[in-house]
Amino acid sequence: MHLDHIYIKGFRNFKEATVHFNKHSLVIGANDVGKTNLIYAMRLLLDRSLSDYDYELSDSDFYAYEDTNEVIIRIYFTDVKDDCIVARMPGKISDDGKMVLQYRVVKNNKKVDYHFYCGKSDSDEDLGEIDSPFYRKFLNLKYISSRRDFWGFINKSKNLLLNQAKENRAPETIIADDALYEEITKKLEYVDEKIPELSYVKNATEQLNKALDKLSIHHREQKIVFDTSTTEIDRVISSVSLASKHEDKNMIIGGEGRINQIYLSLWASQNENSDLSNEVSIICVEEPEAYLHPHQQRELAAYLGKALKGEVILTSHSPFIVSEFSPNSIIRLYKYENETLVASDGCSKVIEEGIDGLGYRMSVIPAEAFFSDYAILVEGPSELLLYKTLATQLGLDLDR
């Protein structure tokens, strides 16, 4: 199954745009050009983490630079052959494996009505209204924001790692683990008996109990003590934390780049190990290069493309990723007057031929031109110094 393209009309900074995708696609463009808005348009149709409240668009979600009362987002799929889709969408897929999903919002006197549609094509005869986006249970989008909650996700996912490792044990390993489990349990019970014998643990709440006794005679029936119970071995195991180990010494994991790599690797491994036979998922990751050096940016982008199942869409500001990415899989967004446009309607042979035409000249410096509105071509380093000096003398900041 392939997400071929998306059509957007009247949504945020998109007046009307069509964006084509490949199996692995890279969305680039300047800041505030609309990369996140493009991904959110897809999420409105496919992200099962969104609620009914999210579908009720606000005034700011409609195209702002003209009087707009309608939003249409339409996604086109081709090569729909997956059993989990075909079996659950009877009559919605054409003989040549095409399917269309549509989300339409109409604003009338501040009242917003939204509807979902599905069909073999985008014609009025084929595109029928459906009650809800029920298909998200087996056809969905998984999204990683550029603002990642590193430790929240890592702490939430550690139990999944433990359970996966637990399920993959050999029979002889299970026997050895069970014996060790019993041994640890007995030692924890011994610790539980000894900790309350420490004088400062036993007497720490003495003043508190005296104060409670003065407040009410009923407090005499119960004493307040520190709970030192550690005998729940499962709770002890679940409370383990990730750390970096060097020569038998544990260290706190440091560096945002390192944490970012752990986050994405953990997320990718979960996706790789999960059973996706009953669903088709499109993966969207915003700015995977955060906090990483150039060579690690390239390596991480390549890793995500290989490790993640299904179609992968990345957004990036990194010329290092652009210079190594497949040319016919690059989607460039740019602004013209008050709307966001898509170069060559997304992934296309035109962009591939243009990049391939650079040949050996393709590097990080030419790749920066993809993020620019204009490019000044110079012959060599001398001319480059000349233009930089000239700009400085004229008070022009070329990076602005």
Stretches with model-predicted labels:
Residues F77-D79, S145-R148, S244-H246, Y334, ...:
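Flexible glycine-/small-residue-rich
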Residues T68-I73, D96-L101, K137-L141, G310, ...:
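Short glycine-/polar-rich loops that comprise or flank the Walker A/P-loop
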Residues V80-E182:
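Electropositive, glycine-dotted interaction segments
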Residues F153-K156, A165-V285:
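Extended helical coiled-coil dimerization/tether regions that scaffold
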Residues V19-H20, Y63-N69, K92-D96, K107-N109, ...:
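Conserved catalytic network of the ASCE P-loop NTPase/AAA+ motor domain
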Residues M1-D47, I237, S241-E368, A375, ...:
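Switch/communication elements of ASCE P-loop NTPase nucleotide-binding domains
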Residues I39-D95:
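Conserved P-loop NTP-binding catalytic core
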